[in-house]
Amino acid sequence: MQYDIAAIVEGYAQGYFLMADERDRLSWYGSRDRTFIPLDERFRYPKSLQRVLNQERFTVAINRDFQAVVAGCADRETTWISPELEKIYWLLYQSGYAFSFETWQGDELAGGILGIVIGGAFIGESMFYRIPEGSKVAMVKLVERLRQRKFVFFDAQMMNPHLERFGAYRVKDEGYQVLLEQALQRACNLV
């Protein structure tokens, strides 16, 4: 099957995101509000995670094993990442839009965050871990990177208790569209 990568990127640039349903049918979705991970002083994390960061047990990499991160994100009891969506992520990666932000412990992939970068927007698609704290360390290090690279926002799409612990907050669609427009005007590089 052929995919129009430009049209897919345009869908994300308009504020939509792809998800597969329980029958693996892929559709575009929107939301009345989005969840942002703060890139300012509102970002926080548990003190216990600071101890892990101080121990420097993990190293960070970008796109060292993109396909393993996609597979890790898809490998759960209920997933919205169908085999078709995995192919699309691979094509977005090859086109310079999809990235994996990874933590490693030696030669073992500890965790990662799968995201799409368009301008100054980082759109987090999913995250996973294989080693405890692996994805949490990835979150902290990714926020540091996005700050350094002057990204406008980190869109985590949907709120959950895990993200709340990092200071995640909701943005109504009108506000999201304004910030998205600002992000699209900025040329940011994750790498």
UniProtKB/Swiss-Prot annotation:
Q: Which InterPro entries match?
A: Acyl_CoA_acyltransferase (IPR016181), Leu/Phe-tRNA_Trfase (IPR004616), Leu/Phe-tRNA_Trfase_C (IPR042203)
Q: What class of enzyme is it?
A: transferase
* EC numbers, comma separated: 2.3.2.6
Describe the reaction catalysed, as an equation.
N-terminal L-lysyl-[protein] + L-leucyl-tRNA(Leu) = N-terminal L-leucyl-L-lysyl-[protein] + tRNA(Leu) + H(+); N-terminal L-arginyl-[protein] + L-leucyl-tRNA(Leu) = N-terminal L-leucyl-L-arginyl-[protein] + tRNA(Leu) + H(+); L-phenylalanyl-tRNA(Phe) + an N-terminal L-alpha-aminoacyl-[protein] = an N-terminal L-phenylalanyl-L-alpha-aminoacyl-[protein] + tRNA(Phe)
Which GO BP terms sit in this record? protein catabolic process
| Gene3D superfamilies, alphabetized | Leucyl/phenylalanyl-tRNA-protein transferase, C-terminal domain
Query: What are the record keywords, sorted?
Result: Acyltransferase, Cytoplasm, Transferase
Main localization is: cytoplasm
Subcellular localization, per the record? Cytoplasm
GO MF terms here are: leucyl-tRNA--protein transferase activity
Q: Has the keyword Acyltransferase been applied to this entry? A: yes
- Any one Gene Ontology cellular component term annotated for this protein: cytoplasm
What protein family is recorded?
Answer: Belongs to the L/F-transferase family.
- Protein task: Functions in the N-end rule pathway of protein degradation where it conjugates Leu, Phe and, less efficiently, Met from aminoacyl-tRNAs to the N-termini of proteins containing an N-terminal arginine or lysine.
Q: What is this protein called?
A: Leucyl/phenylalanyl-tRNA--protein transferase
Q: Which organism is it from?
A: Nostoc punctiforme (strain ATCC 29133 / PCC 73102)
